[in-house]
C-alpha cells in the first residue's frame, strides 16, 4: 500500500461518518447529530428546558404528548471535520503510515463531499503543521498534498496534549479524528464527555493504526527477532518462544490505551493493514457512543 497522490486518490473511500445513531425519542425519524442549534434545517424535538424561549415550542407535539417540546435545527453550517495526524517516528513502522494516510484522505474526501469543512493538524512531540478547516475541491487537494508530503519525524516522546490545545484554541466546534498508534503516554487533561446540556463542542474519535505484529505473534513462534524503537533509537531482541506472554502484554497495553481514551470521552477503534478500514470505520461510527 503506497502513499502517493495517485494511490491515495485511487483508493479513497466515502465514509458514512456524519450520522452516529438514532435518538431514543417518542417521535419517529429523529436522528442524533453532533451539534444542534437554531439554524435552518429541522433536526429534532426535545423537552422544554430552562432558558428555552416559548416561541420555539412545537404545539402539535405538546398537544400529542401532554409535555412541552421545542424544535431544534441543524446549524446553517453543519460542522467542521478535523483530522489530527500523528507523524512521530513510530508511525513509520511497517505499513502504518500508508494505512493512516489512506484513512485520512478518505475522511477528508467524505467530509468535503458532504459539504462540511475539513482541517488537518500534524503532531509528534509538538504541533508540526496546521491547515484550517475549509470546504471545496481545491482545499481537499491541499490536504491530500500535505499528507503525501508528510514524513515521520524523530522525537523522544509523542505528546498529544499540545495538539488538543491547538484544536480547541483554533476550531470552535468539530467532529475530530485522531489518527495514531497511541503507543505513548496519553497526557490528556481535556474531557470530551458530552454533557446533558450539549455544551461540549468537540466530538472526538480515536483511530488506532497498528501493524498485526503489534497486536499478537503467531502461536508457537521460535527464534530471536530484533526490534528497533523508532522513537528512542534503541534495539532489543524479542524471544519469539515467549509469544504467549508477548500477546498478553500487548493486549494489556491496548486495554490501557482504550481505558484512558474512554475516560477522556473518546471512543476508539483499532485498524490494521489487513482490515477493510472503510467498513470498519463506518461500523464504528454507527455505534452509540459507549464512553460518554
What are these regions (language model features)?
Residues 139-174, 214:
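Von Willebrand factor
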Residues 182-186, 211-214:
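Short, catalytically relevant binding-site loops at active-site mouths
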Residues 1-33, 168-174, 193-292:
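Von Willebrand factor type A / integrin I
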Residues 131-132, 188-190, 216-219:
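Short, well-ordered secondary-structure micro-motifs
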Residues 1-134, 175-180, 185:
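An amphipathic, basic-hydrophobic helix/alpha-beta surface used to engage anionic
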Residues 185-188, 278:
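Short, well-ordered alpha-helical microsegments
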Residues 65, 155-159, 249:
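Short secondary-structure boundary/capping elements
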